[in-house]
């Protein structure tokens, strides 16, 4: 099935951290615990061929039952799960976003993308050389930690904005990210577009900078200036040439509308501009997916292999460059739509129906009163990163699909109250909890978002009724020896290319 040319969604329903330890190369991580929330966005077409995989523990069967109830009809389960795949001597991969990470390594190898070591860059900055550092990550990552003097120019914005920041061809441009992939892709984007400057990637990004013993900035707000008409004209022409050379085609709105009605093919419509531009107005139905992130984490946005992908950008530059990379990654049907719409807000993706949902709720005032007299036990089903950042005082962390085990560790009071980010996941889990406890079960209306909005206190004192296996952690987010974790991660990235070649599922090419 893999590589036969037809559409296929290969979905791993284990928790993300477990998924990250070993998984099939082209599998998408959609944990059973959040299946109803995430599946329809990643796999929207009900007739898609779907293969579900697990550890052979039966959770893929539970996922299949939910999907079948919601109209997905072409469902299979990988017999024997991950262990059977390994026993058949097929490759398994660790980490997340593996195809995108491997692609970055491939591009550096095939294109000879030049790079600069942290020590050399530090010396140039100290000597005030004619150099600019462009950080190709989203602003939230940049603001947490950045290279001194670095300006935030997220990946797909580089070709559009770099010449505005470095108008002199004598200025050296250094592109960085946290590790390797976005630095390489960002630098090579500028080279492919033909900027007259010397362009290099910062080898190993901010992690390499830290490992070399240099301090990063934090909390900075250096952003690219607005683009002049001349810069836009140059960038549009350059990006079009790159896109055309990679086989990216442009379409018009009638073509898009015809494809929306095509029930035989999956369509993804992504607005690859800056999120602020998206928020000000976009084509109806488009999902915000800044181009750099779409290339960096394609599997987080696109659940169906072989689907059509339409990239929207009124300036065309971001879509053209993003499309060129997706084509080189092996996505055959990638198109650019140069439009801007008036739609506001994210498109509403239908949440899949659960078999049963409890209707019993409490509001924030009621919950606060229950807690004040020790009459409620709160179980928080939010993602562990969010829980650890701040939660309802006294709340226990648990994962929905492991609720039976978690509840066995929690001393229950008069009422069990479930909460989650916005309450949606808690509603899905309520009936499951009711079958496990004798206490009445209620859901916090509006979830943790409502609690925060009402001004109630949050706590960071963790009560873990389950392990935090729901999320993979970046090296610098992990406890323990951070430097060792960074070195391990960078070595993992570099080692991907030969392993991808052995697997044989991906066919990359370079511009």
Where are these regions (language model features)?
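Rhodanese-like catalytic fold shared by cysteine-dependent sulfurtransferases
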Residues: 1-9, 13-132, 136-268, 272-377, ...
């Amino acid at each position: 099935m893999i590589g036969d040319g037809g559409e296929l969604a290969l979905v791993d329903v284990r928790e993300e951290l477990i998924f990250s330890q070993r998984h099939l190369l082209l599998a998408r991580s959609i944990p059973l615990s959040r299946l109803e929330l995430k599946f329809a966005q990643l796999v929207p077409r009900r007739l898609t061929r779907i293969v579900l995989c697990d550890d052979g523990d039966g959770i893929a069967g539970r996922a299949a039952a939910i999907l079948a109830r919601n109209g997905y009809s072409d469902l299979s389960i990988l017999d024997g799960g991950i262990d059977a795949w390994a026993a058949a001597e097929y490759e398994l991969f660790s980490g997340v976003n593996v195809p995108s990470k491997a692609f970055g390594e491939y591009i550096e190898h095939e294109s000879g993308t030049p790079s600069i070591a942290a020590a050399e860059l530090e010396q140039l900055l100290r000597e005030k050389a004619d150099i600019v550092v462009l950080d190709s990550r989203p602003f939230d990552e940049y603001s947490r930690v950045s290279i001194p003097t670095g300006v935030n120019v997220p990946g797909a914005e580089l070709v559009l904005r770099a010449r505005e920041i470095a108008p002199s061809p004598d200025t050296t441009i250094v592109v960085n990210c946290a590790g390797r992939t976005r630095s390489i892709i960002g630098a090579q984007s500028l080279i492919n577009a033909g900027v007259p400057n010397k362009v290099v990637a910062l080898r190993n990004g901010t992690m390499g900078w830290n490992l070399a013993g240099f301090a990063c900035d934090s909390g900075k707000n250096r952003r690219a200036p607005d683009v002049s008409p001349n810069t836009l004209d140059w960038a549009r022409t350059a990006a079009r040439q790159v896109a055309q050379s990679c086989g990216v085609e442009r379409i018009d709105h009638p073509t898009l509308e015809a494809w929306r009605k095509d029930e035989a093919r999956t369509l993804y419509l992504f607005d690859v501009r800056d999120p602020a531009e998206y928020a000000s107005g976009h084509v109806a139905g488009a999902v915000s997916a800044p181009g750099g992130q779409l290339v960096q984490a394609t599997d987080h946005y696109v659940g169906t292999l072989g689907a059509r992908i339409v990239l929207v950008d009124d300036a065309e530059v971001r879509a053209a460059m993003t499309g060129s990379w997706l084509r080189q990654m092996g996505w055959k049907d990638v198109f650019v739509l140069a439009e801007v719409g008036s739609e506001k807000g994210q498109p509403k993706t239908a949440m899949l129906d659960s078999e049963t949902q409890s209707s019993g709720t409490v509001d924030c005032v009621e919950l606060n009163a229950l807690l004040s007299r020790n009459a409620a036990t709160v179980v928080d089903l939010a993602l562990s990163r969010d829980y650890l950042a701040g939660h309802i005082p006294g709340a226990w962390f648990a994962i929905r699909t492991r609720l039976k085990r978690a509840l066995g560790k929690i001393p229950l009071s008069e009422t069990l109250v479930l909460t989650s980010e916005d309450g949606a996941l808690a509603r899905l889990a309520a009936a499951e909890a009711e079958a496990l406890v004798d206490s009445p079960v209620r859901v916090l209306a509006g979830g943790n978002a409502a609690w925060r909005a009402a001004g109630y206190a949050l706590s960071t004192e963790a009560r873990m009724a389950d392990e935090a296996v729901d999320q993979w952690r970046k090296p610098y987010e992990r406890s323990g020896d951070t430097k060792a974790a960074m070195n391990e991660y960078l070595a993992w990235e570099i080692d991907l290319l030969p392993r991808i070649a052995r697997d044989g599922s991906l066919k990359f090419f370079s511009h």
